[in-house]
Structure formats: structure tokens, C-alpha cells
Amino acid sequence: KRSGYNNIITVEKKKLNLIFQEKVIAFLKKKKPKCIFLAAAKVGGIFSNKKFKANYIYENLMIQTNIIHGAYKANIKNLIFLGSSCIYPKLCKQPIKESYFLSGKLEETNDAYAIAKIAGIKMCQSYNFQYKTNYKCLMPTNTFGPNDNYHKLNSHFIPALLRKIYQIERSNNNIIKIWGDGSPRREIIYSEDIADACIFFMNKKTKHSLINIGTGNDFRIKEYVSQFLKILLPKRKIKIVYDRSKPNGTPRKVLDVSLAKKYGWTAKTSIKEAVFKTYDEYKYSQK
């Protein structure tokens, strides 16, 4: 809306379950949007991805297949599909270029989710080839922001960390426990920057259908923990305990965002600003 778009079509899951193809196609034919931003997906952290692999591959395949094919059936030529940096091999050269796609073995903990996303990318590319559509695939790095998933077992690293910090703030507890040994390096980006990228690339003519979206900067998990504690609880002395019995996941994952920059897009929000905005929204939601 801030960008001047007023005719925005959204629908709640209880009113339209994206698993059901006939209903999705009927909805798209009725509404006839000029463009689609496909961000709907089943997502979660390491624990959830390891335990519910069938759910992750089935639900994500169904959601994206129904919307991408539905867009074609409804003659909607423009679509942005949001993938994930987990589509890239577990052990590949860093920073990760788009050309590394399908060049090696995936991270085992979330391979079901990754394979579903890979299928979505190939589907967009195939429809572009056969039907001359304009379906673009943006691969965001680890995203966080307001209205994130803070579930105890299936949240991603950043919302899980913010939830733990909030619990400490409300108690006399001065210990925070973190999965793994804190050594993996991760890149993070604010959700509003992802939204900005979606609008930018929807309006931008590109030769590429697969584009990385990130900051190009990464830090160790332990560095994020220390930084967030300093930002949000500057007067508290918190002991950080790492649970080495839990998996680390991929050792390092930072995206090469030179292609996005070449087209004229860069992330704008600092980590500090993003953390404050996200944490304030989470605290407000808990009242």
C-alpha cells in the first residue's frame, strides 16, 4: 500500500485451502489478479523439518503447484515465487551463486522442504519456456520480521531466539540455551526488505528467472545471540549455554547477491532496526 497499490487481494486459509486445486483455480479465475506473489508455504525449524518430512514435501508441492498452474489456467502472466536458500547444496562454495543450483547434495535435515521448493522453481521455468509466462523465482536468505512464527518446536532460529530473550526479560532467569555449538554462519534479512524486493522484481524486466535476495553478509550463530542480547537486554548479564547434542545444520550459508544488485536492488534495513521492530511487535502480541 505504501508503494501506491490499492487493489490488493488476500485470502485466509480457512476460506481457501491452497491444497485443493479446483478451488484455487476457481478463485484465481474469479479474481483475475494482474500478478501473484506466491509466499504461501509450510515452513519451520530444524526439529519440525526432520520430524515431519512428509508434511513438508506434500503441502509445499500442492500449494505451489496449484497456484502456479492456476495462474496459467487463469491467464495470469506475472508471478513471483518465493523459494529458499536451502535449495542450494549443503557443502558448496560461498557465497552461493544462482549457478550452484542443482550442483550437489542437499542438507539432510530439510531436504523434503528443499526438494519441494526446487520443484517450484523448475515448474516456473518450465511454464516460462512452454507457455511464455513471466514467472520469477526469488531465493531469500533467512527471513524474520513482524508476525513471525514463534512456536517452541517449529520456529526458525531468529524468532526462536527472540522468544527466549522475551522469556528472560520477564523473569529472573539469566541463562539462555541455544541449539548446536553456535559455530554455523547465517545470513539474515528483514521481511519488509523481502517485500520490497518482490515489488521491485515484479516491475523489473530481467533475463534471469532465479535471483538471490539477501544482504550478502553473514555471522556466526553465537555472534547473533550476543548481538541481540546487547541490543534488547543491555543491562542484563546473560549466560549463553550451547546444547551440542542438537544439530547445527549447514555450516555456512550466505548468498551471492551481486545479480540482484546488478538489477538495482539492495536491502535497506539494518539488523538493529529490524530487531527492534520485530521484538516490539512480538512483545505487543503477548500482552
Stretch-by-stretch model annotation:
Residues 83-84, 121-149, 159, 170-177:
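Conserved beta-loop-beta element that borders a ligand/cofactor-binding pocket
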Residues 65-110, 136:
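Conserved Rossmann-fold NAD(P)-dependent oxidoreductase catalytic core, especially the SDR/UDP-sugar
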Residues 17, 87-89, 111-112, 136-158, ...:
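Flexible, glycine-rich beta-alpha linker
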Residues 2, 167-287:
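C-terminal substrate-binding subdomain of Rossmann-fold SDR/epimerase-dehydratase oxidoreductases
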Residues 21-61, 73:
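NAD(P)H-binding glycine-rich loop region in Rossmannoid oxidoreductase-like domains
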Residues 9-22:
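Rossmann-fold cofactor-recognition segment
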Residues 61-67, 116-124, 158:
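Conserved catalytic Lys-bearing alpha helix of Rossmann-like short-chain dehydrogenase/reductases
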Residues 102, 112, 116-119:
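Active-site helix of classical SDR
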